[in-house]
């Protein structure tokens, strides 16, 4: 039960943060591209890399608590691959194939690259 509360609390924080990034991106960049979703997927990948490295460095029993709250809860609520999938499908339905390909390829590749960058940064910081 305690883990469920950690996931719920973390998920609430992550979801609110995701919403605020989306609102901010829409205000700054406009509706022409899903900038908010793109941003949270890349930033979320980087933060997950940092978290994974930090937890591996800690290596104690409290690491599971942090993993559940931050990794599953906060970052699970923050990153939005379900929204990403919907937005890509909508682009395809509109026959915007080039935009759909560019958006999906850039999101996946940059999120993975950002995760590796997060691992490298955190290894240097926590080593």
Curated annotation (Swiss-Prot):
MF annotations from Gene Ontology: fluoride channel activity; metal ion binding
Pfam families: CRCB (PF02537)
Annotated keywords: Cell inner membrane, Cell membrane, Ion channel, Ion transport, Membrane, Metal-binding, Sodium, Transmembrane, Transmembrane helix, Transport
Localization: Cell inner membrane
Catalytic activities: fluoride(in) = fluoride(out)
Means of activity regulation: Na(+) is not transported, but it plays an essential structural role and its presence is essential for fluoride channel function.
Signal peptide extent: none
Residues engaged in binding Na(+): 76, 79
InterPro entries: FluC
Main location: membrane
Any one GO BP annotation for this protein: cellular detoxification of fluoride
Mode of membrane association: Multi-pass membrane protein
Record HAMAP family: FluC (MF_00454)
Record function comment: Fluoride-specific ion channel. Important for reducing fluoride concentration in the cell, thus reducing its toxicity.
Similarity section: Belongs to the fluoride channel Fluc/FEX (TC 1.A.43) family.
Protein's UniProt name: Fluoride-specific ion channel FluC
